[in-house]
């Protein structure tokens, strides 16, 4: 049995996906484990080694999240995406408890250990009741770096905000516009010019902060997005089952269009005597009108130019259009007047007339009401069944939540450029994936930028 080259490439793509998932999850577990052992590390190394270790962890985080997003873009099963989301939620709850203020951590531990576990008898399992607080601390890693309530509140608000974008296409589109155009290009360019001048005059280095943000947002962020789009196209290209379904659907739509066109052609009556005989023209026109009344209607408008009337006929025809993967019937008006035979005065008279709404023809009115934004990045439509977009957004949000805990816990050890690279990259990835999750990869109407 001969194996097709497409099948071989598809298998290789899946092997790459498994490899990337394995590496990225290992990096994530290692990062969370280093966070749990933070107290022991801090007691054994100086500030320089701690700073180097923190920077290495940030680099690991970048490698992990990029490899994870690339692997996910190749295509995941629904159960696998939900498994990943559940795993990251559990790990994030564990991190949240680690960073609770001390009083809240103690109250939660007492509530869980002495308020819940005390109701059960652990004698048969060999667990001593007095050791339950220790087991609790070992599972959650202890209260390693307490945050203030304000910081935890800001983190929670950002998680809720980006989660909301994943369900609201209007907010996602507007935020994408603000983030990519106003912030990433206009404001960044203005600050780059201002800080370049002030740094030369005052011997400062603020311009590196702006460059770091631009690098994270427009280089790392958009670079990762383009790789994702490439893999979406590649994985759908190698999916024989999905492609065969699309081909069958396309052939079915084309057959429907051909049948409708044939029906319209059968109802057309050609009046060949209209320019030779007035009576035959009149009789032929009446027969044509009666024969085609079921499929078209004729609207006549008259324009007077120097006592010469110009008769324009707008014939209403029904055409078949494709909208959101469905074939729909739509009426359009076609002007049958031969403008090449009109003189200049007649053309000016027609152009000076107000345009009626019935004269405006369009294949899809909703397309003309939409707006096309700059940085128009579109996911392929045939990737619908391959990407669990909302789970994807949720997992990436929790990846960003992990690095935010690293940055906040040792803020004094990191430089502003290092932080801004993370902020720019995270903002671009989350904003883009939110627009994907909101509407592009569902069966709803397309995003505004897809029109």
Swiss-Prot record:
Keyword Secreted included in the entry's annotation: no
This protein is called what? Answer: Putative uncharacterized transmembrane protein DDB_G0281465
- Coarse class of the primary localization is membrane
The answer to keyword Protein biosynthesis applying to this record is: no
Keywords, sorted A to Z: Membrane, Transmembrane, Transmembrane helix
Domain of life of the native organism: Eukaryota
User: What cellular component terms from Gene Ontology apply here?
Assistant: membrane
Task: Write out the biased-composition intervals (Low complexity).
Answer: 253-262, 280-300
Instruction: Give the start-end ranges of region Disordered.
Output: 250-300
Q: Where are the transmembrane segments?
A: 11-31, 56-76, 151-171, 175-195, 207-227, 392-412, 413-433
Where in the cell?
A: Membrane
- Membrane topology according to the record: Multi-pass membrane protein
């Amino acid at each position: 049995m001969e194996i097709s080259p497409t099948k071989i490439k598809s298998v290789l793509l899946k092997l790459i996906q498994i490899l990337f998932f394995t590496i990225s999850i290992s990096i994530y577990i290692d990062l969370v484990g280093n966070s749990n052992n933070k107290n022991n590390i801090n007691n054994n190394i100086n500030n320089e080694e701690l700073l180097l270790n923190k920077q290495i962890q940030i680099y690991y985080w970048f490698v992990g999240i990029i490899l994870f997003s690339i692997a996910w873009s190749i295509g995941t099963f629904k159960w696998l995406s939900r498994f990943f989301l559940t795993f990251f939620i559990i790990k994030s709850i564990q991190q949240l408890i680690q960073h609770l203020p001390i009083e809240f951590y103690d109250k939660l531990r007492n509530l869980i250990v002495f308020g819940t576990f005390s109701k059960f008898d652990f004698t048969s399992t060999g667990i001593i009741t007095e050791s339950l607080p220790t087991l609790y601390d070992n599972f959650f890693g202890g209260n390693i770096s307490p945050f203030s309530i304000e910081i935890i509140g800001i983190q929670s608000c950002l998680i809720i905000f980006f989660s909301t974008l994943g369900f609201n296409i209007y907010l996602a589109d507007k935020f994408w516009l603000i983030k990519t155009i106003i912030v990433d290009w206009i404001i960044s360019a203005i600050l780059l010019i201002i800080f370049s001048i002030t740094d030369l005059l005052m011997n400062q280095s603020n311009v590196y902060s702006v460059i770091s943000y631009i690098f994270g947002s427009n280089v790392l962020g958009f670079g990762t997005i383009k790789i994702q789009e490439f893999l979406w196209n590649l994985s759908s290209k190698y999916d024989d089952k999905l492609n065969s379904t699309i081909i069958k659907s396309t052939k079915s739509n084309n057959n429907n269009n051909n049948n409708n066109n044939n029906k319209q052609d059968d109802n057309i009556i050609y009046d060949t005597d209209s320019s030779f005989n007035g009576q035959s023209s009149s009789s032929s026109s009446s027969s044509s009108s009666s024969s085609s009344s079921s499929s078209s209607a004729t609207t006549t408008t008259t324009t007077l130019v120097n006592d010469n009337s110009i008769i324009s006929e707008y014939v209403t025809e029904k055409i078949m259009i494709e909208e959101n993967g469905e074939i729909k019937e739509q009426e359009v008006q076609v002007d049958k007047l031969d403008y090449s035979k009109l003189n200049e005065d007649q053309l000016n008279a027609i152009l000076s007339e107000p345009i009626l709404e019935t004269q405006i023809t369009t294949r899809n009115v909703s397309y003309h009401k939409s707006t096309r934004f700059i940085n128009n990045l579109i996911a392929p439509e045939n990737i619908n069944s391959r990407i669990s977009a909302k789970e994807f957004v949720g997992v990436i949000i929790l990846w960003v939540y992990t690095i935010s805990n690293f940055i906040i816990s040792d803020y004094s050890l990191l430089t502003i450029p290092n932080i801004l690279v993370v902020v720019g990259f995270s903002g671009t990835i989350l904003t883009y994936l939110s627009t994907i999750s909101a509407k592009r990869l569902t069966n709803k109407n397309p995003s505004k930028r897809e029109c």
